[in-house]
Regions:
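Compact integral membrane and secretory-pathway proteins
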Residues: 1-134
């Protein structure tokens, strides 16, 4: 396992762990009421489901496989969208909590890792010289 592969794997799994921790953290506070990502109108369960799917594609992403890159990028996009949508949906009033911000930030790092791996894969697959026939 190369240093790059190990680093991508650690960042990927660390981001997944932080996103799940964020789901169980405070997403909205209104007075004495505090809700996490699984309570009330929030869709934190989607973040958990897609984070578990990303675990399956994490190794493929770290090796630079297209299936892993696309899987992680798509799941991270859904995780970001879920957090941003719940953040902008101000049904209860009050203010946003640390959990929703942690979930959005960790999901954004996960998407960034997928984009970085995709760019590295594309740049690494180009040849320096034009191909000639034998």
């Amino acid at each position: 396992m190369t240093t790059f592969t190990r680093t991508i794997t650690l960042v990927c799994y660390g981001s997944i762990a932080l996103a799940i921790v964020g789901v169980f953290g405070t997403w909205r506070t209104a007075g004495a009421v505090s809700l996490d990502g699984l309570e009330g109108p929030y869709n934190g369960w989607l973040v958990i489901i897609f984070a578990l799917i990303v675990i399956a594609g994490g190794r493929s992403l770290s090796r630079g496989g297209w299936l892993g890159i696309i899987l992680v990028a798509g799941c991270a996009g859904v995780m970001i969208l879920t957090g941003v949508e719940d953040l902008s949906d101000d049904v209860l009033g009050g203010r946003s909590g640390w959990g929703i911000w942690l979930t959005i930030a960790a999901s954004s790092v996960l998407a960034g890792v997928a984009v970085y791996s995709g760019v590295k894969r594309v740049r690494g697959s180009r040849r320096g010289e034009p191909r000639t026939s034998p």
